[in-house]
């Protein structure tokens, strides 16, 4: 059982509650607060020099965060997800900005101030999307803004170097979000590995193999997992988004408007965002089978909210996942559920075998005692 932790305090709490690593660190949370202005300058930069300057500031800021989290989890795996949400989430609300512009016009603001505000509003409008969840986010951001995965990888690698020099054992894992095409993970992995080499050359410190993997959160990724696994050291099933995309449910919309009637009318037995749906579980199982067939020894986990649900944990154990990851306060409950699954499941755990002899793995029930 690992934990989802986005800051050093959560990492330390997770460790105290028995987590055996960090299964998800969401780097976008590190861009909020005082740093929001830096990411805004990066997004809205007019020149490559301006963007490069903002990128370096972001990288330096994140290096400190990664250093603290990796230090707190010394010797344990820490899976760091590259930037995932749409960029407009870091910008001012266009409606609020339009209201501000109208007030400026009424109050007689200078022509220069009005021109700058109008230009900003136009840039923000250009970044708005009809369906941001399936738009410019995840790994797609890395192709639209190549500086992003580089600056984040530099920060991870530099933090790792600092800790190694202190005699510690940092174990970062870098996770590429929202992959559905094998070419996406192939190209993004190459970008990440080049950035790691940059830091090795810069510092003279050999970092060894830093695992690079991906989130499986789209149905196509699950059914094409054998191709994706060729370029991924691990899969982490993002069951929140996988549930939305598999069921066609927008969580923000259906939880208040659809699910109450569905639950009351017994159309569905339970909230699929709390306990994993059987169709989503089949996609996870397919991803596990295909991934292990193509890459024996690949690490498989879950980092959605289902990772803290006892019923879902039993399902994931039977499907052969290696770990679940949940919020820090759900770690004790998840550990208990994992122990119960281990003791009562009739399914035999996977046993690592040599790649050359590995067929698609099959789950076999234990033989009844003689």
Region spans (language model):
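Conserved alpha/beta-domain cores
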Residues: 1-347, 357, 366-370
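Intrinsic low-complexity/disordered segments
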Residues: 361-363
């Amino acid at each position: 059982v690992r934990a989802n932790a986005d800051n050093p305090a959560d990492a330390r709490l997770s460790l105290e509650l028995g987590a055996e690593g960090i299964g998800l660190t969401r780097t976008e949370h590190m861009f909020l607060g005082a740093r929001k202005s830096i990411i805004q300058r990066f997004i809205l930069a007019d020149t490559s020099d301006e963007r490069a300057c903002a990128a370096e500031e972001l990288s330096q800021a994140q290096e400190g965060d990664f250093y603290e989290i990796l230090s707190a989890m010394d010797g344990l795996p820490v899976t760091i997800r590259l930037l995932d949400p749409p960029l407009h989430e870091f910008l001012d609300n266009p409606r609020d900005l339009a209201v501000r512009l109208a007030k400026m016009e009424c109050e007689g603001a200078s022509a220069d101030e009005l021109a700058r505000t109008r230009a900003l509003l136009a840039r923000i409008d250009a970044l708005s999307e009809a369906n941001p969840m399936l738009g410019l986010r995840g790994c797609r951001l890395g192709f639209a803004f190549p500086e992003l995965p580089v600056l984040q990888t530099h920060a991870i690698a530099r933090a790792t170097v600092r800790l190694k020099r202190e005699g510690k054992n940092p174990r970062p894992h870098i996770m590429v979000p929202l992959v559905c095409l094998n070419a996406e993970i192939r190209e993004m992995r190459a970008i990440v590995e080049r950035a790691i080499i940059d830091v090795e050359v810069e510092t003279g410190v050999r970092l060894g193999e830093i695992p690079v993997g991906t989130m499986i959160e789209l149905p196509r990724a699950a059914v094409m997992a054998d191709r994706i696994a060729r370029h991924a050291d691990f899969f982490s099933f993002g069951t929140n988004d996988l549930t939305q995309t598999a069921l066609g449910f927008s969580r923000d919309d259906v939880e208040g408007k659809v699910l109450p009637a569905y639950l009351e009318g017994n159309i569905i037995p339970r909230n699929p965002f709390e306990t994993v749906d059987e169709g989503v579980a089949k996609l996870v199982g397919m991803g596990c089978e295909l991934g292990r067939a193509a890459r024996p020894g690949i690490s498989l986990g879950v980092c959605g909210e289902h990772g803290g649900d006892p019923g879902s944990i039993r399902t994931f154990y039977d499907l052969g996942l290696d770990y679940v990851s949940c919020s820090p306060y759900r770690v004790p409950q998840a550990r208990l559920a994992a122990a119960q699954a281990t003791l009562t499941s009739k399914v035999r755990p996977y046993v690592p075998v040599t790649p050359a002899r590995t067929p698609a793995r099959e789950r076999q029930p234990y033989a009844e005692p003689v």
